[in-house]
Each structure stands twice: as C-alpha cells, then as structure tokens.
A protein has these predicted regions:
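Non-catalytic pre-domain segments flanking phosphatase-related domains
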Residues: 1-84
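Exposed alpha-helical structural elements
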Residues: 18-21, 52-57, 108-111, 123, ...
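Alpha-helical substrate-recognition element adjacent to the catalytic core
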Residues: 30-46, 69-77, 89-198, 217, ...
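C-terminal cap/substrate-recognition subdomain and adjoining C-terminal extension
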Residues: 52, 137-138, 145-288
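Asp-based phosphoryl-transfer active-site loop
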Residues: 79-95, 245, 250
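Residue-level marker of motif borders
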Residues: 80-82, 114, 237
Length: 288
C-alpha cells in the first residue's frame, strides 16, 4: 500500500478544502496529522489508487502544497546514504554565478547556468568550461567574499542532523567547487564530498579546473561509490537536487527528491519540495 503526504510551511495554511478534494479522489483509509514545528502536514493512509495513478492525479490537484506518494512503513533508518546537491539545494545560491559578479560576467554566467540546469545544454562539462573561462583572472579573494554571503537553505541542518542520527552517510555531490564544499563539510559534519577543483595560479582563477569535471554521471557515480563503500544497494539511498545534472543521481537512488527543481527534474523525481524546506524530506517517513 501507499500513503500520500501533503505539507506546507508553518507560515502557510494547508487548505482543508484541498485535503478534502484530494481525499475524495484517492480514497484513503484514514487521514492523520503529522506533528511538526516547521510545517502543517497530513498523511493520507492506504490509498485506493496505485502509486502511478495517485501521482498523476496529484500533479493536477496539489497546487500550493508539497506532496509525495510513498510506500507505507517508510523509515529513515532503512536508508544508508543521503546525497545532496550543493548549489540551489543545500545552499541558496549558485556559487559560480556569484563569482561572476566580481568579474562583471554574472549575467552571462547565470544565463548559461540556467540553461544547463534546465537541461537545455546537453553537455554539462562544456557548459562549465564556458562559464569558468569567463572567470579567468578573477582574484582568489573573491572566493572568501562569496563564502561569507553563502546561506544554507531552510531545513538543511535539521535534515542532515536527522540523517546522521539515523545512521546515514551524508554525501555532498556537486558540480560546484571543492573550495566551498570542503568548508561546508567542516561546518556541517558531512561524511564525504565530490566536487570540482578550481585551478588557481598567482592568486587568481585561471578559468579552468584540475582533474575530471564532476557532471551528472560523476554525481551518480559518487552515490554508487558511497553505497559500495557501505555495502548497501542504491535503493537504500536518498538523493536531493534541483538541476538536470542531478537527474542521474536522483534516478539511481531509491528516493529521489526535487528541491525547487527545474520542470524536468520535478517530473522525474519521486517527490518535490516547492514550498517546504529541506526538512520536508523527513516528513515523508513514518518514523526515523
């Protein structure tokens, strides 16, 4: 059997009329509130529809609320890996766009980033090379300036803390840069990272990376490597991301979550968070 989770942030209202409309269509055995200090949420148990039918229906009905159709008795501790994207997922910015501000190329870089994240540029590695080339000559000190402005997305710390408490390995897999990923690793106690290494010479960015570029395939491989190291199956992994280069990672995981995802990512993901913070992932589970 499957359950349906509906949720909105605490500052919003979960419309009773919406819950009633949804219940009329999916015909749950019961409706139960989910206790949370950060959201208004309900669980509709044992749906009369199968998961595919319920998901198709919810894409039509659930405007204004986050939703997910999940197996019953889903527990966080049954998973072993939590894989997170960095830019626009764990943190609220696209770091390469912010680096472009110092070189006066932010608009050009941001346009390429947006196209790449929407999947309009098939070769992610080439899109990164194009953006990096626009940063050539940028002072290394700009990295620290961007770091000082960097903010975690809402619910990030709660999600990571709960994952660690349940025994999960937390992986940061990003097409961003080790300079930032390593600092986030130290700040948040992340277990491992996979990221691109900026090439820096004489105190300036060269506009290149060192080593292979971390693209969508490399993110997927990072998840598979973490699972192999732990001796678990990829279906025991949760992956969270927003862009087209996250699709391989989300597809490999047992639970793929789109966080403020691009349209193609939301269509492919098992769940989407467009309103709640990252801690919304936790409310998909009946228990830790």
């Amino acid at each position: 059997m499957h359950h349906l989770v509906l949720q909105v942030p605490r500052h919003a209202t979960l419309d009773p009329a919406l819950v009633a409309r949804v219940a009329e269509r999916v015909r749950p055995a019961s409706i139960e509130p989910i206790d949370s200090p950060h959201a208004h949420a309900v669980r509709l148990r044992d749906l009369a529809l199968d998961a595919g039918e319920a998901s198709r229906l919810m894409r039509e009905l659930a405007d204004g609320a986050d939703w997910a159709v999940v197996p019953d008795a889903l527990r966080l501790r049954d998973f072993r890996v939590l894989a997170l994207d960095m830019d626009s997922t764990l943190v609220s910015m696209e770091t390469i766009d912010e680096l472009g501000e110092a070189s006066g190329t932010k608009a050009q870089i941001a346009a390429i980033t947006e196209a790449a994240m929407r999947g309009e540029i098939a070769d992610y590695a080439e899109s990164l090379r194009r953006r990096l080339a626009l940063l050539a000559g940028t002072p290394e000190s700009v990295l620290e300036q961007v770091w000082q402005r960097m903010q975690l997305n809402p619910g990030a710390e709660q999600l990571i803390a709960a994952a660690h408490a349940a025994g999960l390995h937390v992986l940061l897999a990003t097409g961003g840069f080790t300079w930032f990923a390593e600092r986030l690793q130290r700040r948040l106690g992340l277990d491992s990272i996979r990221a691109n290494q900026l090439d820096i010479a004489d105190g300036r960015l060269t506009g290149r990376t060192r080593g292979p570029i971390v693209d969508g395939a490399a993110k997927r491989q990072a998840l598979l490597d973490a699972c192999a190291e732990l001796g678990c199956e990829p279906r025991q992994a949760i992956a969270v991301g927003d862009g087209a280069n996250d699709l391989p990672m989300l597809g490999a995981a047992g639970l793929g979550v789109a966080y403020r995802g691009k349209p193609a990512v939301q269509q492919a993901a098992d769940a989407a968070l467009n309103h709640c913070g990252l801690d919304g992932v936790l409310r998909l589970f009946e228990e830790a």
